[in-house]
Amino acid sequence: EFPTPLTTGLQVESIVFPSSVKPPGSTNSLFLGGAGVRGMEIQGNFVKFTGIGVYLEDKAIPLLAAKRKGKTVAELLDSVEFFRDIVTGPFEKFTQVTMILPLTGKQYSEKVSEMCVGVWKALGTYTDADGTTIEKFLEVFKDENFLPGSSILFTTSPLGSLTISFSKDGTIPEAANVVLENEKLAQAVIESVIGKNGVSPATKQSLASRLSDLMKQFDEESNGSVEVEDLSKNSCK
């Protein structure tokens, strides 16, 4: 078994993402793969909406490293397949979306739903069951209001379920608000952040940089090398 990677926590604006968390609906502790801001250029200013942290189960490192010996951060960042493997890999993922600006649950869920349904219809994979899941997804969010500092939390299980939880104060609750059994939606939520057209390039950059270091460390340790890189000097500021 691969030991828990030694990672640092990260701060995005005023949001602190700890180095590991135990997500709602999970029995595992997951490590912080990367974190970054989500924003948009509005009238010449970059307006920041949310900070996003992506956590992964320990076994993600050997699985991702197997195909990517010696890849640079830039090569990982340019690789659609690398991020696709994070999205679809057989390990648990946890995505924390914390508000910098206020947002209503209705605004958030409608945007995510629209995007998912659009992609599924384009791929010809949209079904009645997906329609039912999307209705449930919209229902969970409809009365929620997210003030700055509050979070939307998604636990993506390799068995195909999506656990959704809300936090008003930065703590991670133990109980879930809802569990949806739909693998496509479970993957789509994380893909919307780090996929080919993901909304947070900063989170992708952070993941590529930190996972590159961790995969290098894993390769060296598996090759019996005693030279373990000092990750602190490469960590994202």
Curated annotation (Swiss-Prot):
Name of the top EC class for this enzyme: isomerase
Pathway participation: Secondary metabolite biosynthesis; flavonoid biosynthesis
Catalytic activity: a chalcone = a flavanone
Keywords from the UniProt entry: Flavonoid biosynthesis, Isomerase
Source organism superkingdom: Eukaryota
Any one biological process term the GO annotation gives: flavonoid biosynthetic process
GO molecular function: chalcone isomerase activity
Function: Catalyzes the intramolecular cyclization of bicyclic chalcones into tricyclic (S)-flavanones. Responsible for the isomerization of 4,2',4',6'-tetrahydroxychalcone (also termed chalcone) into naringenin.
Protein's name according to its UniProt entry: Chalcone--flavanone isomerase
Lineage, highest ranks first: Eukaryota, Viridiplantae, Streptophyta, Embryophyta, Tracheophyta
